[in-house]
Amino acid sequence: MNYDLIIIGAGPAGYVAAEYAGKHKLKTLVVEKEYFGGVCLNVGCIPTKTLLKRAKIVDYLRHAQDYGISINGQVALNWNQLLEQKGKVVSKLVGGVKAIIASAKAETVMGEAKVLDPNTVEVAGKTYTTKSIVVATGSRPRYLTLPGFAEARQNGFVIDSTQALSLEGVPRKLVVVGGGVIGIEFAFLYASLGSEVTILQGVDRILEIFDTEVSDLVAKLLQTKNVKIITNAQVTRANNNEVFYSQNGQEGSVVGDRILVSIGRIPNTECLDGLNLQRDERNRIVLNQDLQTSIPNIYIVGDANAQLMLAHFAYQQGRYAVNHILNKKQVKPAQKLTCPSCIYTNPEVASVGYTEMELKKQGIPYVKTNLVLAHCGKAIADNETNGFVKMMFDPQTGKILGCCIIAATASDMIAELALAMGAGLTVFDIANSISPHPTINEMIADVCKKALFDHFK
């Protein structure tokens, strides 16, 4: 059967592409091998945030006395009920994704796709022809290939982020290999739920892609939960539930009921292996600025192109690819610099634009201003004063170069700054805006007002 568009993958990039294609009357086929909604909805963003919210409530209950509330009796955790709630949330949202695809009048087929040529896709022995192909196949966890890890994984001791969402119970001891975003979120989750957590990080600090103030504060917050962080730890091997590492020439080891390996993700592009696509020196498929491969009617979007593995970045890329197929200019390409990133710890971390570290490395002139949450009335009222808002500006124009926020509502606050950066707004624009009071959000305008006095007199 002939289609205008075949979309391989029904995750964030894929289903949004299908929705946009449907609005423009393209005859569309969506191929999905496992999860409608992709990793994000089924075994990523949504289920982790569901569990992290419950973990945050546990934190509040354990510290109820700090809020003048006495609880008689023990705070008990019902893990099975938490998993059941997680499943209901996922099921509801998967239904929503299926409804979006159906309302776009896109056809669907289940199975693993293989692109045979620029216009033909094979699924479960059947072939489908199309004018354009959008590959939105997502990514998968990267595994350690060091000695003993394959056996430990086979024996159920070594797990990935997908398995960490459906354990039979809260592990008494959890080892997290990798101190990036995913590893840190799981460390917060399980430490709040009662696990004894140890993080093995290969470099000198956790969250190394963020500025040092972020790493330092998050490390302190983890330590209040009795999380042990071992930095400069080069993992060497595993023996079932024991991980061995080298640190400053000395060998050490740590034992856990489960060992969560969180060292990044690999794009799923095997469906394109039969094509002679242009690749770079690292064997990655080369794309142009419009997300086209060297075969122009084949696009790769979302995690599958590994440009920025975030669902909201994938949404925009999915829309943009279809927009480009239609030869329209309604959708702007996704820009890394104005795409916010968040860590759903307690408090949350969010950033957009350059980090101060990147500005220094690239020699970009900047001025910075920051305020701690201890100056914010709402934060004091909420008894949540751990955190800060830091912003960097162009010293000549006042344009926003970057921002980092640690606050209970950081993931909601950062959207304002992503919009401001994308629109080219300046420190003057935000300083002259009126924020509701009392809110944590007014810290953004307060930082800009302080910056005017500090740097733009």
From Swiss-Prot:
The active site is at H437. It catalyses: N(6)-[(R)-dihydrolipoyl]-L-lysyl-[protein] + NAD(+) = N(6)-[(R)-lipoyl]-L-lysyl-[protein] + NADH + H(+). Its cofactor is FAD. Its EC number is 1.8.1.4. Transmembrane segments: none annotated. Keywords: Cytoplasm, Disulfide bond, FAD, Flavoprotein, NAD, Oxidoreductase, Redox-active center. GO terms for cellular component: cytosol; membrane. NAD(+) binds at G178, G179, G180, V181, I182, V235, S262, I263, G264, R265. The keyword Disulfide bond applies. It is an enzyme of class 1 (oxidoreductase). Binds 1 FAD per subunit. PROSITE patterns: PYRIDINE_REDOX_1. Disulfide bonds join C40-C45. FAD binds at E32, K33, E34, Y35, F36, G37, G38, V39, C40, K49, A113, D303, A311. One of its GO terms (molecular function) is flavin adenine dinucleotide binding. Pfam families: Pyr_redox_2, Pyr_redox_dim. The active site is a redox-active disulfide bond. Belongs to the class-I pyridine nucleotide-disulfide oxidoreductase family. Homodimer. PANTHER family: DIHYDROLIPOYL DEHYDROGENASE, DISULFIDE OXIDOREDUCTASE. This is Dihydrolipoyl dehydrogenase. The lineage of its organism: Bacteria, Bacillati, Mycoplasmatota, Mycoplasmoidales, Mycoplasmoidaceae. The gene is pdhD.
